[in-house]
């Protein structure tokens, strides 16, 4: 039977860290990978056969692969982050939160229904307010300390259409909202294929359009659509919407449909 130990102790045993203190610092900086995924806590149990790696300083070490998704969206939409107050709904380990901080966010509210997932380096950052055991549908300006200038969302096992009222309610009228649409949670269960993957491009288009139209009902218009550069863990292709209240940059109904189909055809 494989021996199990704390990941910080195992890093020292394998010579990947000089001490448990250094191991904890590496984990807090997002530089340790457990079977390819970011280590979140020094106390995480691993076996002596678990693949452990430490990212070198020459590589940009994000706390989760999700960071690469948001980087792609912010660059595609040319959204400025510096100096803005932000909400990260569905923060999990904090990939989106880290990207926002890296791009100069003044303040990030990291909200998640789970507990103890956010990386230590982010949890201890004075610019971050952590809201755990918090359902995104229950978010309010009062709960997050006032309205924000930028909302990002990476939510699972829930339809964005049901969460949008809370998200837009937390945003200032000048804000940008960038939610990640996951078709597997928007279409009916009977339309999800083997492994939980939505293969049909038409179903994916329908799910993105449904979220965009729900946003429009709430007074938020689609300015852009972009496929995430990384698929979800099961292989689902996911899509970012860029929402604003201003109508001068809004896509027309036909323009929105064209943008969605283009994002699907150009996506991974």
UniProtKB/Swiss-Prot annotation:
One of its GO terms (molecular function) is toxin activity. Its EC number is 2.1.1.226, 2.1.1.227. It is an enzyme of class 2 (transferase). PROSITE patterns: S4. It catalyses: cytidine(1409) in 16S rRNA + S-adenosyl-L-methionine = 2'-O-methylcytidine(1409) in 16S rRNA + S-adenosyl-L-homocysteine + H(+); cytidine(1920) in 23S rRNA + S-adenosyl-L-methionine = 2'-O-methylcytidine(1920) in 23S rRNA + S-adenosyl-L-homocysteine + H(+). GO terms for biological process: rRNA methylation; symbiont-mediated cytolysis of host cell. InterPro entries: Hemolysin_A/TlyA, RNA_MeTrfase_FtsJ_dom, S4_RNA-bd, S4_RNA-bd_sf, SAM-dependent_MTases_sf, TlyA. Pfam families: FtsJ, S4. It is found in: Cytoplasm; Secreted, Cell wall; Host cell membrane. Its main location: cytoplasm. CDD domains: AdoMet_MTases, S4. GO terms for cellular component: cytoplasm; extracellular region; host cell plasma membrane; membrane. Keywords: Cell wall, Cytolysis, Cytoplasm, Hemolysis, Host cell membrane, Host membrane, Membrane, Methyltransferase, Ribosome biogenesis, RNA-binding, rRNA processing, S-adenosyl-L-methionine, Secreted, Toxin, Transferase, Virulence. Belongs to the TlyA family. Acts as a host evasion factor, that significantly contributes to the pathogenesis of M.tuberculosis by modulating adaptive immune responses by inhibiting host-protective Th1 and Th17 cytokine responses as well as autophagy. Catalyzes the 2'-O-methylation at nucleotides C1409 in 16S rRNA and C1920 in 23S rRNA. Is likely involved in ribosomal biogenesis. Also exhibits hemolytic activity in vitro, by binding with and oligomerizing into host cell membranes. Can form oligomers on macrophage phagosomal membranes. This is 16S/23S rRNA (cytidine-2'-O)-methyltransferase TlyA. The gene is tlyA.
């Amino acid at each position: 039977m494989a021996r199990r130990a704390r990941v910080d102790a195992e890093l020292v045993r394998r010579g990947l860290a000089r001490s448990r203190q250094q191991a904890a610092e590496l984990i807090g900086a997002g530089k340790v990978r457990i079977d390819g995924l970011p280590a979140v806590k020094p106390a995480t149990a691993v076996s002596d056969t678990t693949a452990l790696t430490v990212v070198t300083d020459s590589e940009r070490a994000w706390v989760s692969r999700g960071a690469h998704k948001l980087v792609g969206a912010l660059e595609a939409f040319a959204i400025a982050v510096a100096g803005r107050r932000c909400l990260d709904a569905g923060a999990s380990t904090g990939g989106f939160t880290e990207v926002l901080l890296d791009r100069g966010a003044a303040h990030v509210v990291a909200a998640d229904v789970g507990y103890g997932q956010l990386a230590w380096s982010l949890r201890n950052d004075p610019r971050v307010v952590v809201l755990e055991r918090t359902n995104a549908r229950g978010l309010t300006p009062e709960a997050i300390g006032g309205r924000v200038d930028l909302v990002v969302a990476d939510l699972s096992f829930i339809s964005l259409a049901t969460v949008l009222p809370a998200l837009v309610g937390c945003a200032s009228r000048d804000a940008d909202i960038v939610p990640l649409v996951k078709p597997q949670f928007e279409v009916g269960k009977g339309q999800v294929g083997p492994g939980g993957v939505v293969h049909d491009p038409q179903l994916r288009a329908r799910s993105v359009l449904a979220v965009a139209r729900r946003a429009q009902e709430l007074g938020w218009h689609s300015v852009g659509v972009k496929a995430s550069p990384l698929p979800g863990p099961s292989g689902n292709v996911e899509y970012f919407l860029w929402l604003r209240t201003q109508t001068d940059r809004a896509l027309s109904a036909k323009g929105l449909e064209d943008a969605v189909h283009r994002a699907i055809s150009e996506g991974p």
